[in-house]
Amino acid sequence: MESTPTKQKAIFSASLLLFAERGFDATTMPMIAENAKVGAGTIYRYFKNKESLVNELFQQHVNEFLQCIESGLANERDGYRDGFHHIFEGMVTFTKNHPRALGFIKTHSQGTFLTEESRLAYQKLVEFVCTFFREGQKQGVIRNLPENALIAILFGSFMEVYEMIENDYLSLTDELLTGVEESLWAALSRQS
């Protein structure tokens, strides 16, 4: 018999896949149970309902993503461009570990089903990125565009590249990642 953590992990994995592919409204608890290979009742041992499941999953991935992009900056004193490199590396690491999670975060970030705790976690992520861009603008390094435009350039482009990798239109290589990072930097910086 599977252990409790293994079942819960299977439920999270199945939920992430289905929510990312189908969205919240089109995903049902029986679909999640079938994909996770657990009984439908098993899900309700861990989660009150679909809303509590999606919120826990959302918070988990938002917080982990924030940790990934923050981690390189904590000790970074070599300059703004190096800080950008660490954020990019954090994005790559997170996406390699959770291929569908960024898409899930993006498509569910404005969901009416999100709790206050989920909204605050997402706001903390957005504020971290905005603060990074504001600092770059103060230093004259980052283009004078609205923060949301800068976020769209960074994450939108990155997510599109990773989607092409997932669908085998691109091969994940160090050269590709270096080129993508340099292209994103050129799009965001005044020094391109």
Curated annotation (Swiss-Prot):
HTH tetR-type domain ranges (all copies): 5-65
UniProt keyword annotations, A-Z: DNA-binding, Repressor, Transcription, Transcription regulation
Keyword Transmembrane helix: no
Cited Pfam families: TetR_C_10, TetR_N
InterPro entries documented for this protein: BscR_C, DNA-bd_HTH_TetR-type_CS, Homeodomain-like_sf, HTH-type_TetR-like_transc_reg, HTH_TetR, Tet_transcr_reg_TetR-rel_C_sf
Residue ranges of the annotated DNA-binding region, renumbered to this chain: 28-47
GO MF, one annotated term: DNA-binding transcription factor activity
Function recorded in the entry: Negatively controls the expression of the cytochrome p450BM-3 gene at the transcriptional level.
Name used for this protein in its record: HTH-type transcriptional repressor Bm3R1
Native organism: Priestia megaterium
